[in-house]
Every structure is written in C-alpha cells, then in structure tokens.
C-alpha cells in the first residue's frame, strides 16, 4: 500500500457471521476502493440472499442466550467493546479515511462519536424500566415489563461508516437483541473492524453479524421479508426507505428510518455573524457536505446578507482540499463518480436558473471525485438546487426580508430532519424554534448530534429516534402483566 494507504491490522477481507470469518457461499467478491486515489484497498465477499439467511439464522440462535444475560452482564461486554474502539481510534480512523475519504481529523472524531453510543447504551440498558400501575379492582395488580424485540437488521450508509453502526448496534445489544448488519458497499471495512473488536471484547458468536454485499436490493429484500427479523433500522435516502417500509409491511416489522434531509440554516439580522459563519462552515462543509443534517439551504436576512456572504466566502476560499490522509486537509473527495456528477449538475442547474457563483463552482484538480467548496448567491426560493439534498460542498444563499418569509421558505419541503438558526432575540428564538417543522433544531449551534439526545426527523425524513433513552425504546417491547386473585 502507498503512504496514504498504510497497512492496517484491522482491515479484514472476510465477512463475519456466527463468530466466524467467512467467504460468500458462491465465492464472489467485490473491490473496496480509496475514493481519493482510486487505489484498491482490498476485496470482500459479495454475499447474497442465501448468505443473508445464514446470518439471520445465526442471530436467531444467539438471541435467547444474549437476552438471558443480566443487563449488567451485557453492559460489561459493551464497555469492553467501547474501550477497544477507543484504544484503536487511530487505526479505525485511518481505515475510515482510506475507504470513505473524509479528512483524518474528522475520521478520528467520528470514531469517538461512534464509541460514545456504545458507552451510553452500556449504561442505559440497565434502565430498561417497567412500571407498576394502580389496579382497577382490589384483587388485581398491574405491571409492565420491557423485553427485547428480537433479531434486528441494520442497513447502514457510507457517510458515517462507524457511527451509524454503533448508533444502532449499541441500543440493540443493550436491550438484549442480536443484529445482522449490511454496511454500504463503499465502506464495509469499518464494519468488519468493529466486528473484530467486538469479538475481542467477548461478545458471543451470532450476536453481531456483518453481511458484506454489492447486491443491496437482494440482501435488503431478504432482511425485510424474513419473518425471523423483527425490526429493521435503516439510514439512507427517503426513496429507499419507502421501498424498505413496503417490503417490511407483510411481516409487520418494527421500523427505525433515518432518511433524507433538506436542512435550512437561517441567519437573522440580530445574529452574531462570526458565530453564524462558524456554524455554517461546520454544518455545511464537514465530510465534504455529505451528511443528512448538513445545512442545505442558507437563508440570510437582507440587512446582513452581504456581510455574512463576504465572511463565509473568505473562510471557504481558505479550505485545503485533498486526500484525507494529507496534513491539514479539510475537504476530502466525494464518495464516487455518481456523487461528483450530481453535485456538478446541481450547480450548473442553479446557475442556469439565475444563481451566481461566488466561490468555487467547478471540479477540483486534486482528482476526479473532488469538487471545489462552493458558495452560490442570488438563489431564488424556487431554484431547483433548493429542492434536493445536495450531498456535496455547495452552499446556496437565499436572501429573505421577514421572519415569516424565512419560516415559510424553511418549511417548504417534504423533509423534516434538522434545521438551524442564529439570532439573539429570545422571543423570536422561541417562536422560530416552535414553528420550524423539523425533528431537531440547532439554535445558535451548527453541530447538534450527540448520544445524549434523540436524533430523528418528521415528515418524509423518517420514523423513530436514535440516541438517548428514546433510542433504547426502539429495541424494546412493552409487555403488560395483569395479576388476578391477589386478595
């Protein structure tokens, strides 16, 4: 491997099922490439429906014994996993940068962020409380208990290849569920590295299973249609989420769906502009704009629009673009050619519809998957770029006059994942926070996700919540007990 792609002991080239490292039954494999360099990292098994059924069966066999452990015993296993993840933070970050492309500093941050979900749910699993209920007659006693859903399927994306796994596996395992994980074909190596560390932590065979595959439709259909799987957790596009939801309907699976976003970022005239610029930079450009909660539309009140645009442009022009392994890199590559083509097309369409390119607006010479960090001004509310999740380092600026206009523009979307706004008038802060139709709102803050708070959206941005106590509830069933003949 090259200097930018070092040999790493946690890179695995086999799938992980039932405590074994294994090939696909048919012997097929697919390549995992470094998006910054185009170099081959390794090949992994290309598993199909039959392989997936084996993984589900392994999870089913392991689930009763795992659920029978006390919450504290499961907690101890999860803590051991958490500690191993943090002990291997540097290597996990290098694997992530190699296969996903994000700058190494961001990758290290994601490893710590991802590990925090394991740590949090190691504790929260001990608090899966039932309750007692006053009876409806003197000889009755009523209570509820919590029990694990059972076998869980998780389909995870490439943009956060560690955190999106731990945010699902942490609560699932803490609740007493077992899990079958289908990571994105672009980033299977982070998932396999996590499995290797889980194995070292003493998590039993069959509790965690990793199905690597380039056959997303076939594997997804098996996970959705198989009666043994009692819950599906998916992070990805709204289009695919709707498809999976339909496929799960026949077996009435529990669902957690974290889907697309179209996040507004509103700057009011009383905002601290320096803080707003810092928030916009963090929210818009991390991971080269490839996050579901990225600021997708930046709405700036007319009286401060030009000053904000000037400050933002100065910062964006200074970004260092390149291989994520490079010293000081701030913007890495897009994940693949389709992503790069989409970003270029959206910028061209926006310009054709009247937007002006203030910064960037073209491919970057670092390589075919790199795009210049871009700012567009003069973007009308009906510009096509405001209707799509950009998933790239492009910030469209929209000028507005009044609070009511900003809220109307912000809510004019079928999505409702995250929103952000900056302002200091306390009355307006409350009004706007309540009127924005989003599951999460950052107020004078551009980075809002944490294991401590419930993450999720409304409208077509999904179902359920991840993180916090709500995240554990997603993997538990409530059973009602009625005791008679007590008197």
Residue spans for each PLM region:
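Hydrophobic face of amphipathic alpha-helices that form TPR/SEL1-like repeat modules
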Residues: 1-36
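ALDH superfamily catalytic-core signature
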Residues: 239-380, 443
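Conserved C-terminal structural/oligomerization subdomain of aldehyde/semialdehyde dehydrogenase
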Residues: 37-43, 229, 266, 320-321, ...
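Short, well-ordered beta-strand elements within core beta-sheets of diverse protein domains
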Residues: 41-47, 62-68, 154, 265-268, ...
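Rossmann-like NAD(P) dinucleotide-binding subdomain of oxidoreductase/dehydrogenase enzymes
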Residues: 130-275, 400
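Structural signal for hydrophobic packing residues in well-ordered secondary-structure cores
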Residues: 63, 67, 82-89, 93, ...
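Residue-level signal for inorganic ion chemistry
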Residues: 38, 59, 74, 96, ...
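Glycine-rich loop-to-alpha-helix module at the N-terminal edge of alpha/beta enzyme cores
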Residues: 39-128, 139
